């Protein structure tokens, strides 16, 4: 069985043109319409009119300084509206924008700069030393630009790019279907990070698909047609495809984005109260922290009508807790990956608990068994996706790109799922993360969901380790809200062992101070397993 979402028409405009046209519309409706406000410093704000002008100025700086179509511009800064303005300017000048995690070490930064061949890099005061160290002996790097004041020479200030007259210079011709607009790097959970080539068409079609979906959902929860949120909180990092796309989508709608340089729980809750935030987007790690935070009772969050949780699996038990805490809020989950731009599935009001929803417009899916035959409803298999949001491929890795595709152009996701008769899809686990216990497959995510139901558990990571009698056995690393004693360990084991089949039973619990995750909240399961095994060896 193959499911198809609502059809979409192809767009023939570069994404920056689409956005610049919308900025003019926002400006005409309200010349004082604000695009961005910095959460930590509200005096640092930018209107849509100013944003449009800065994009033109920045694009002309790139052209005047000899940068060509296809050159790579790297964002290596914590979130800031200047990053978005610079990205739009670079796109208009024909450049590819890549983005690196602001928490990177110089080793990690060097890998991405060298792999992407980034010629110009945007930094802030926090990332500048790391980038400078990473760029040693990289002669192809031509310029570092800092959004912070008074950078050391030869680093130049961001203001240099925007303190110029617009001369209406000729810009390169863009082919939306084939030209790359964004080059984020995959998380590297299956090896070294790979550059993911996202085209102008990928972004434009994802915009159209998301707008249709969200408009339909707004109507379903009682909001008027074409309703525009007055404010939105933005703390998802722009180095991630989801973070960058949400910035595009929200600015397209004309919503004022309160942009966080770094995430801060109390500042988030304070701003929900201050701006009467209606819709909130979280990664699972932040959602779990919010569930366990006493600060939630300190602020009025009654304005919330919807909370979207994405970028990594969100356990059903955590979702239920969130609904108990915020009973009047619609919890929306979805499914996507960097290679799929933003999302392929999103929940609608009425979606069953535990699902990631149905296909967004323009998308098709099938689920394959191990023998290659197609699954029917409630049969478990691997999810394959086809749609206009599919990446062009991996940067300089044609063979690895081809290995992802089948003869019909569907892309394998590596995720184990099942669906019901309505196309509601349920994620079970990653293929490579399944634990084999006496030849039976155990999904870590299932065990994590049950463990999180226990009142003493704040966070958890489950993985498999070698076992002489069963092949592998599941181990849980747990962040406890209370004790780390044997009694707590036994209570957690009893909880899970009462609920699940014997072969899924946890045999060992290791208490830890934190669970390692990527910046977007994905569990670093392999890193947690390595740390566990290293600690075991050290005790021998």
UniProtKB/Swiss-Prot annotation:
Keywords from the UniProt entry: ATP-binding, Fatty acid biosynthesis, Fatty acid metabolism, Ligase, Lipid biosynthesis, Lipid metabolism, Nucleotide-binding, Peroxisome
Keyword Iron-sulfur (UniProt): no
A GO BP annotation: fatty acid biosynthetic process
Species the sequence originates in: Caenorhabditis elegans
Residue positions binding ATP: 186-194, 415, 430, 522
Tissue expression profile of the protein: Expressed in intestine.
Superkingdom per UniProt: Eukaryota
Cited SUPFAM superfamilies: Acetyl-CoA synthetase-like
Role noted for this protein: Plays a role in ascaroside pheromones biosynthesis, which regulates development and behavior. Specifically, activates the side chain of medium-chain indol-3-carbonyl (IC)-ascarosides for shortening through beta-oxidation. Converts IC-asc-C7 and IC-asc-C9 into IC-asc-C7-CoA and IC-asc-C9-CoA, respectively. May play a role in fatty-acid metabolism by activating and converting nonanoate (C9) into nonanoyl-CoA (C9-CoA).
EC top class named in words: ligase
Protein name per Swiss-Prot or TrEMBL: Acyl-CoA synthetase 7
Location of the motif Microbody targeting signal: 538-540
Name of encoding gene: acs-7
């Amino acid at each position: 069985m193959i499911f198809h979402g609502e059809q979409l028409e192809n767009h023939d405009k570069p994404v920056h043109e689409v956005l610049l046209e919308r900025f003019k519309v926002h400006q005409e409706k309200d010349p004082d319409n604000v695009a961005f406000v910095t959460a930590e410093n509200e005096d640092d704000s930018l209107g849509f009119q100013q944003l449009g002008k800065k994009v033109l100025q920045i694009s002309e700086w790139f052209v005047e300084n000899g940068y060509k179509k296809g050159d790579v511009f790297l964002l290596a800064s914590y979130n800031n509206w200047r990053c978005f303005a610079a990205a739009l300017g670079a796109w208009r000048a024909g450049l590819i924008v890549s983005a690196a995690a602001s928490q990177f070490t110089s080793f990690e930064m060097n890998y991405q700069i060298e792999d992407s061949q980034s010629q110009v890099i945007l930094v802030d005061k926090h990332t500048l030393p790391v980038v400078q160290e990473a760029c040693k002996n990289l002669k192809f790097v031509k310029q570092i630009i800092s959004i912070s004041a008074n950078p050391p020479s030869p680093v130049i200030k961001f203001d240099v790019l925007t303190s110029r007259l617009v001369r209406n210079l000729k810009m390169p011709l863009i082919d939306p279907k084939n030209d790359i607009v964004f080059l984020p790097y995959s998380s590297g959970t299956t090896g070294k990070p790979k550059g993911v080539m996202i085209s102008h068409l990928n972004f434009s079609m994802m915009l159209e698909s998301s707008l249709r979906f969200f408009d339909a959902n707004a109507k379903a929860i009682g909001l008027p047609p074409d309703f525009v949120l007055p404010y939105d909180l933005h703390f998802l990092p722009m180095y991630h495809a989801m973070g960058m796309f949400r910035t595009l989508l929200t600015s397209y709608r004309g919503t004022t984005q309160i942009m966080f340089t770094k995430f801060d729980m109390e500042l988030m809750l304070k701003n929900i109260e201050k701006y009467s935030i209606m819709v909130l987007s979280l990664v699972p790690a932040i959602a779990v922290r919010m569930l366990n935070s006493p600060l939630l009772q300190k602020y009025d969050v009654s304005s919330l009508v919807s909370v979207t949780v994405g970028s990594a699996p969100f356990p059903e038990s955590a979702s239920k807790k969130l609904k108990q805490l915020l009973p009047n809020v619609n919890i929306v989950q979805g499914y996507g990956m960097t290679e799929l731009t933003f999302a392929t599935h999103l929940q609608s009001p009425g979606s069953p608990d535990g699902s990631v929803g149905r296909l967004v417009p323009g998308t098709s899916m099938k689920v394959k068994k191990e023998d290659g035959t197609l699954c029917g409803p409630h049969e478990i298999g691997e999810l394959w996706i086809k749609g206009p949001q599919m990446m062009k491929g991996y940067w300089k890795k044609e063979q690895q790109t081809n290995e992802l595709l089948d003869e019909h152009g569907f892309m394998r996701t590596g995720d184990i799922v099942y669906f019901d008769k309505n196309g509601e899809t349920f994620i079970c686990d990653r293929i490579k993360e399944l634990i084999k216990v006496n030849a039976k497959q155990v999904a870590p995510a299932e065990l994590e969901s049950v463990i999180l139901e226990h009142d003493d558990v704040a966070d958890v990571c489950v993985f498999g380790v070698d076992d002489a009698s069963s092949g592998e056995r599941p181990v849980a690393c747990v962040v406890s809200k209370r004790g780390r004693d044997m009694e707590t360990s036994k209570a957690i084991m009893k909880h899970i062992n009462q609920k699940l089949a014997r072969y899924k039973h946890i045999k060992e619990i290791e208490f830890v101070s934190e669970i390692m995750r990527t910046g977007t909240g994905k569990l670093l399961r392999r890193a947690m397993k390595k740390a566990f095994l290293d600690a075991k060896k050290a005790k021998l």
